[in-house]
């Protein structure tokens, strides 16, 4: 390829050389084995999905999708997430499979970086979907397996932020906020701009503004009780029976969130658990518990997940569900993944012994060894520098005199 783009890559895409791929494969295998021990079975879905279904149900902004046309002229997209395609799979190919379904995956997802944005357009995700188990046990299982995954990767100082996607909308409904007020508050929370949220709550003022401000910060039992009392008082004063019921639902969800975190903390005392009632996820299909997992040195979440009880219904199979996705390369940026040594036996290909050299290579590979074929030219220089080792037994120069090299050594870019 000629021209200015001969060695360039599209915005958001990058090459993965052998050293990185070896680490990606090792950590992926570790995670998939962990998931298998918890009963999850691996699946795969197409990289291309119809925009009218997956593209719409994923609730990812159209500007962030890669649109294409298939051979019949239908609009398709590179999958922007894995949860929606697996929901389609569970409602179609696996429709007759009894629930619950425990499914795992390791696949890339694609989201188009916007102008001026930095980041990857192709991200490798490794994750699970638990379909057919409701809140409570299902939510705790998702948190347990996600925490186990961070620990298995060696993530330093793992921590989780856990919220409930229904809490903020319920609080807004109980307080009977105006549409403009809701929009300003929701936008601030989506951007994690808590100063803007506080300012918007301050403009509303009074007891309503104070109740909104109580959403911010880590949730403790005392704060949950205070928020519940505040909502009860405001809704009763309004005389709106529906608002009173909504306030009661908020209290129940706050209590369930704290109970869930208490169980998680008891199971993983070395993991930090933080309840955040103002956690607003960026995917609209979440209906309940949502969470993010971090580690020391990670500037962004290593794992994201949550409950999506209505997504499968859009494909015709009603079922509660939850799951999470780990960001493989983001995790590798902060952990060491030691690779087992893999010594290689060098086999020289000399003039007149080509067939014998490959016979020797096949024999050693069949015996479980790793080989490296070295072609020696007439000038005495081999394709690997001619210095991998002297000829050994075999009389035809098949063996490199015990010369062994380990993958991932000096110069391998790690």
Predicted features and spans:
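Acidic, His- and aromatic-enriched active-site or binding-groove loops in soluble protein domains
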Residues: 64-72, 177-199
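Cap/lid and interdomain-hinge subdomains that line or gate substrate/regulatory clefts
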Residues: 134, 138, 161-162, 171, ...
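Positively charged, Gly/Ser-enriched RNA/tRNA-binding surfaces
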Residues: 2, 20-38, 49-50, 83-96, ...
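TRNA-binding/sensing appendages of the translation machinery
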Residues: 1-84, 140, 161
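Hydrophobic mid-domain F-helix/FG-region of cytochrome P450s
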Residues: 145-152, 167-176
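Short, basic, helix/turn surface patches
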Residues: 67-81, 187, 394-395, 399-401, ...
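Short, surface-exposed recognition loops or helix-turn segments adjacent to catalytic cores
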Residues: 157-168, 185-186, 274-280
């Amino acid at each position: 390829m000629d021209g200015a783009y001969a060695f360039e890559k599209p915005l958001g895409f990058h090459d993965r050389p052998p050293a990185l791929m070896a680490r990606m494969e090792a950590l992926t295998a570790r995670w998939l084995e962990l998931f298998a021990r918890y009963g999850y079975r691996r699946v795969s879905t197409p990289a291309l999905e119809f925009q009218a279904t997956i593209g719409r149900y994923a609730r990812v902004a159209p500007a962030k999708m890669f649109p294409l046309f298939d051979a019949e002229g239908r609009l398709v997209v590179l999958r922007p997430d894995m949860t929606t395609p697996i929901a389609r799979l569970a409602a179609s190919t696996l429709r007759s499979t009894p629930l619950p379904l425990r499914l795992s995956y390791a696949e890339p997802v694609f989201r188009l970086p916007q102008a001026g944005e930095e980041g990857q357009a192709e991200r490798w995700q490794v994750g699970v979907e638990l379909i057919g188990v409701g809140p409570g046990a299902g939510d705790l299982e998702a948190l347990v397996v996600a925490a186990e995954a961070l620990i298995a990767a060696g993530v330093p100082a793992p921590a989780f932020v856990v919220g409930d996607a229904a809490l903020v909308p319920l609080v807004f409904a109980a307080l009977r906020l105006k549409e403009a007020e809701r929009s300003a508050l929701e936008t601030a929370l989506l951007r994690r701009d808590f100063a803007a949220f506080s300012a918007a709550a301050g403009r509303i003022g009074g007891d309503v503004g104070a109740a909104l401000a109580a959403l911010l910060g880590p949730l403790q039992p005392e704060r949950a009780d205070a928020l519940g009392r505040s909502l009860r008082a405001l809704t009763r004063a309004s005389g709106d029976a529906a608002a009173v019921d909504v306030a009661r639902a908020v209290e129940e969800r706050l209590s369930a969130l704290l109970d869930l975190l208490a169980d998680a903390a008891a199971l993983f005392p070395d993991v930090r658990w933080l309840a955040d009632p103002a956690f607003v996820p960026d995917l609209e299909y979440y209906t309940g518990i949502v969470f993010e997992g971090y580690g020391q040195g990670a500037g962004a979440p290593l794992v994201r997940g949550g409950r999506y009880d209505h997504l499968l219904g859009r494909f015709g199979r009603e079922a509660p569900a939850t799951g999470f996705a780990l960001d493989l390369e983001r995790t590798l940026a902060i952990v060491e993944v030691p690779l087992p040594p893999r010594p290689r036996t060098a086999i020289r290909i000399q003039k007149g012994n080509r067939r014998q050299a490959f016979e020797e290579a096949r024999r050693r590979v069949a015996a479980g060894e790793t080989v490296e074929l070295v072609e020696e030219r007439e000038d005495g220089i081999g394709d690997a520098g001619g210095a991998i080792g002297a000829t050994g037994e075999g009389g035809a120069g098949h063996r490199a005199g015990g010369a062994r090299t380990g993958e991932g050594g000096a110069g391998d870019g790690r």
